[in-house]
Amino acid sequence: MSYERVTPRARQGTTGICVEMDVTAGNGVWIQPPDRVAAVTIAVHIPSGQTGSFTIETSCNRPETLGENATGGYWDNVYGDGVTLNENTVVMIANAVTGIRVNCISGAINVAFCG
């Protein structure tokens, strides 16, 4: 799977985050929540008339371990091992993690990170 990073950790500061990206099957998007953001809301939407399946994962490894492409470290599915979602989903995660990533398994999705 290929991941695109939507925002670097050091560039957001106290202004918060609000970014989104369209993601297609076999790709993903990830973020390192800024230190001063208390929580991040992840909203995943499947475009009207389309289908899509995806996972949402978090990691607590050091940013250096995660790397620039989010393929390092250990990642945990927030809904449990092997759980794949296939409907619009919104979840809030406290900023006690170093990385959040969304994997598009099939179809197409829109992913937004706000905090």
Task: Label the model's feature ranges.
Residues R9, P34-D35, S48, E64:
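Generic low-complexity segments that are intrinsically disordered, proline-rich and/or Lys/Arg-biased
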